[in-house]
Structures are given as structure tokens and as C-alpha cells.
């Protein structure tokens, strides 16, 4: 029983940490990256960039930690899906780290650009564009990995009734919409800055906060823990 309770609390806390740090990190530097003179602005806001990227790194590790905390519980009900969720969320973490590395390289490029003045400006601009593209594509692929992993553990939650089905159904739908939005962005049919993209991702954002509070306050269904035999074994 302690394993279920402790892991539920840890997963809930990590859900909050992953979401909050990701939002704070990305939103704080968005105006800088969107500026027309971003190569100058990045260098001028070096401290903010470093703090924001540290927050994104925390988010990346917390994201992987969520599935790792859930794995000992979910494997009792469906080991393949539990393992798959860990794999995809670790992949998500790695992709976000790639995005962070791209922005750290962009910070170095920005500093060199400012020091060089007008010399080789076009080369700096091309390099900056490529690094921003790496960050963008890594982020979208990270969303795909996240939503795939999330849908796997929501399926196990739904089948096992460890958490209420209305909450897991909400999570699965939200993850599916978020996955669709990322695929549409990669296909060039949707902008990551569009209202549609934001709406498609809002559902899973709210649901994960509700799930986090549920896991921390109530944990997993005690009647399922006490009496229900593992499924999928």
C-alpha cells in the first residue's frame, strides 16, 4: 500500500513541476526568440536565457520521472504499456534536452554576433535560423513522444480504474488532441503560435493539473489495490 501511495504523491508532484517549469521557461524567453533582432536580444538577456533553460531542463527530467514513478504500479496491470510509457517519456526528455542545447549554442552564437558587429552578419543569421529550427522541431517531436507515452498510461488507468475513468478519459482525449496538433505543425498545416494549437493543448494542460492534485490528495483507488487482480498478465 505504501508503494502505491508514495508513488502517487511523487507522480503528482512531478506533474506539477514538469508543467510549471516548462511553461515558465518557455514563456519567459518567447518574446526574445520572436524578436526580429533576436541575436542581439539573446545576448542582452543572457541571465534570463540561462535561468529559463535551467527551468526547461528541470521540466525534462521531471517529465521522465512521472512515467518512472508510475511504472512499478502500472506494470502490475499491463507491463508492456507501462514500459512503453517510460520509453516515450524518456524520449520526450531527451528531445527537450536537445532543444536546450540548441538554445545554449544560440546564446554563444548571439554573443559572437554582438562582438563581431556587422562582419559576416548573414552567416550568423543563417546559423541562428538553423538553431531555432532545431529547437522548434525537437519541441514538436517532444510533444509527440509525451502524448504517446501519456496515452499509454491513460489506457492502463482506464482499464484498471486506479483513477476515475472520467479523469483518464479526459486525459486520453487531451493527449490525442495535443498529438494531432503537433503532427499538423510538423506537416505545415498549423502554426504553433495559432489559437487552434493553443486550444488543442489546453485540455491536456488542465487535465494534468487536476490529475496531479488527485494523485497527491487521493492517490490510487484503494478498492482496486486491495481486490482487483492485475490485467494484461
Stretches with model-predicted labels:
Residues 1-233:
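Hydrophobic, aromatic-enriched alpha-helical segments typical of multi-pass transmembrane helices
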Amino acid at each position: 500500500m505504501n508503494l502505491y501511495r508514495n508513488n502517487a504523491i511523487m507522480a503528482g508532484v512531478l506533474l506539477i513541476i514538469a508543467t510549471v517549469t516548462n511553461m515558465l521557461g518557455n514563456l519567459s524567453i518567447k518574446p526574445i526568440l520572436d524578436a526580429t533582432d533576436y541575436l542581439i536580444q539573446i545576448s542582452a538577456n543572457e541571465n534570463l536565457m540561462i535561468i529559463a533553460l535551467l527551468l526547461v531542463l528541470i521540466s525534462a527530467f521531471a517529465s521522465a520521472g512521472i512515467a518512472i514513478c508510475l511504472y512499478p504500479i502500472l506494470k502490475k496491470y499491463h507491463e508492456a504499456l507501462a514500459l512503453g510509457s517510460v520509453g516515450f517519456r524518456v524520449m520526450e526528455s531527451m528531445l527537450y534536452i536537445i532543444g536546450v542545447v540548441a538554445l545554449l549554442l544560440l546564446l554563444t552564437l548571439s554573443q559572437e554576433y554582438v562582438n563581431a558587429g556587422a562582419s559576416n552578419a548573414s552567416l550568423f543569421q543563417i546559423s541562428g535560423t538553423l538553431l531555432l529550427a532545431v529547437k522548434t522541431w525537437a519541441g514538436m517531436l517532444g510533444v509527440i513522444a509525451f502524448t504517446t507515452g501519456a496515452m499509454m498510461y491513460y489506457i492502463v488507468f482506464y482499464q484498471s480504474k486506479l483513477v476515475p475513468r472520467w479523469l483518464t478519459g479526459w486525459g486520453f482525449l487531451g493527449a490525442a488532441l495535443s498529438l494531432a496538433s503537433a503532427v499538423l505543425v510538423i506537416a505545415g498545416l498549423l502554426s504553433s503560435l495559432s489559437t487552434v494549437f493553443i486550444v488543442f493543448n489546453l485540455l491536456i494542460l488542465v487535465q494534468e493539473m487536476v490529475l496531479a492534485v488527485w494523485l497527491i490528495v487521493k492517490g490510487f483507488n484503494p478498492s482496486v489495490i486491495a481486490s482487483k487482480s492485475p490485467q494484461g498478465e
